[in-house]
């Protein structure tokens, strides 16, 4: 669940839309061991480019916390394509946590949690995306 979405920057050249958006999801982890995790650790900036011709969105998500951004990489591509008179959405992405050797087992758990929560966000955005497809992607030219 997203607590905040703020558009920081948007450029539209007619073919591509470049944007930066700040997201602050609801924290899913309150503590790691005895240490509390501040809610701001979950905030991130999405830098993305939507290519109208390719119907493709390339993105990089960078945590706003410097401490977290040095330990995490998240990139991906979202594609829309015609599929039997309907629109198919596919997403390829990578979440990588760069932790010290002795914390490597936590990286696998952390990556799985981040992926699960990211999929929840994608599911919640589906009604909005369906409207976007109807009004923008399939709009008469």
Question: At which residue positions do the language-model features occur?
Answer:
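A conserved amphipathic terminal alpha-helix motif
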Residues: 52, 106-140
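Structural motif
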Residues: 11-13, 53, 83
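Polar/charged alpha-helical tracts
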Residues: 3, 30, 131-134
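Short, mixed-charge, low-aromatic patches
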Residues: 2-5, 34, 82-85
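Short Pro/Gly-enriched beta-strand edge/turn motifs at strand-loop
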Residues: 26-32, 57-64
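Beta-strand/loop substructures that line and gate deep hydrophobic ligand-binding cavities in soluble
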Residues: 17-20, 37-39, 43-44, 49, ...
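Hydrophobic ligand-binding cavity/cleft-lining segments
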Residues: 1-27
